[in-house]
């Protein structure tokens, strides 16, 4: 009788082990491995240049100069959003434009141009280079920090580029005040170092 009970116990243990192995195999077949993320996807690349990092109080290091972000303009055209950051630290008015267009992060270093006598046209020549109109439109804007603009309003723009895309122009009209011209050049993220802005009042991590 004792030997019979031992045999029954061994059989039960073997059946239990077989059941565990089969369940583990089924779980392995049904499980979906975690997918790896594209390191150059817009949400990955843009995080260092997004509104959480770039804003009033942030530092942008470029060409051996540390520029302080004095103010930020957030622009909305339908569902499309982009930012313009006023920089203090160099000669003249410098702006850093940031947008994600069709999944690609685009950064532009803009310089305000005065005394040029230019107005929007199909082609605009500046610095002996021909710029052709690339796009135009209108947007709503809101401001944070010091920008020289009202807290919110409307603007129009007409953007230009050279054939090789190395030189850009932008005419902007803020609330009907007249066209202002800026010249720009595309930047790569690796050319700049961003030291994040302090948290805004009421945001997580803010300290009075």
Regions found by a protein language model. Name each.
Residues 1-84, 88-208:
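Mixed-charge, low-complexity intrinsically disordered regions
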